[in-house]
Amino acid sequence: MKSASSSFSSVIIVYVIVVTVFVSLGVFVDGREFEHGRAFGRGSSLKTTIQTTTSEEGQQQRHEQQQQQQQQQQLRASSLLLTRAKEFVLKSLGGKLNKKGTDLEEEEKEKETRRHSSSSSFTSLSSLVSSSLKAIESRAELREKFRHFVSVQFPEKKKEYERKTEEEYEKRMEIFHENWKRAIEREIDDRKGGGSAKHGVTKFFDFSEEEFREQYLGLLSTSTSSSASKDAFRKHQMEAPSDEDLEKLPQYYDWRARGAVTPVKDQGQCGSCWTFSTTGAIEGANFIKTGKLVSLSEQQLLDCDVGCAPDIPNACDSGCNGGLPSNAMEYIVEHGGLDTEKSYPYKAYKEDTCRAKEGKLGATISNYTFVGKNETHMAHALVKYGPLSIGINAAWMQSYVGGVACPWLCNKDALDHGVLIVGYGEEGFAPARLHKEPYWVIKNSWGMGWGEEGYYRICKDKGNCGVNNMVVAALNE
């Protein structure tokens, strides 16, 4: 932290020195000319009245005019130089970079900038030790905030709470308070990791950590699930990309801009995240092959897929009780495809009967592959194969509101949620890097009312929350 702060301070000092020198010459940061002595003002043209009473006086005044013109040219050159210096410093602080990549990549960058324009481009030193949430100071304040949570922020909860006993109401209010305090801690933790994420009140604030995990997560949390079955991994391991392939990777990439991502879905209170992570990857692979975006059936996987991972005890897909995307893709390969969402709609619970034969086939895959932990290789796989199905530790997501999350204390091995990587980019100033912070764009399955319209951004190249521990790509060759 000290080294990051000193690096930040050094850049600021350089900037101040540059500005001071040029302001003394009569030039402001944005290139506007101020008074230099009393020769000229901002926006004024040099006006010289040449007296012609004598030849000597005329020569003297012409000489003064030439000097003033030279001074004006020097100041303009200084202004240009200062602008270049400012651009250099702004780049160091995370300002606008030079344009790179294709027109489409630049368009994606501009969309990302507009989408997250409310996020600060700089991380202030004070934000490293504070949270945007304030501690609740009294019982009365807690009651008011909880009432607002139930009645105003999430009015769909109002009827539910009208049926609760006073004892249950008090219990939920205490859980709300614990989540409030935890959100403050997590935002501070994100700052320590170099992130810009905001944590606040979400629809999950009246769920304990255990309830949240049971009802909204669903990736099988076995000790070996992060590396999948050893036999399966060897059989399906992706070949490492060449250096030439990696050099060609674009700076920004987003499958949403290319039309390969369906709208954000909502799994409800069912641990079916693994099915949404799976269908998202196959929807993308199918789009790359056919040019058509077809929403696929999560319900078919809930009802029909009971496959198990070899060599992993209790790693069998089990409806709302959890599953693994690799198991699901194995089922889809063996079954011959996956039905459309329309023909086999989602119900948020497992039915007793598999109705796969009754539905309309929406997409097929030829195989799947495990991507290694190298996040540059992950970016290559994303660009080549489409959106990636991954596992993640979702503890910090319960209170996530927006921004780039870089959880410092998030356990990388405790994967409990299946999500979908759809792109990557970079934004803002990172104290530890002195340049923009790279991030993954993740599609979640908790509806558009959560996070950034249903999406989550997390630091790239750091392995935060195990984002690189279980990565699967669908193949459609």
Predicted regions mapped to residue ranges:
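N-terminal secretory signal peptides that target proteins for export/translocation
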Residues: 1-7
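Cleavable N-terminal signal peptides of Sec/SRP-targeted secreted and luminal proteins
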Residues: 9-28
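Catalytic-core signature of thiol
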Residues: 26-58, 62-64, 73-117, 121-477
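Short functional hotspots where side chains directly engage DNA or cofactors
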Residues: 66-68
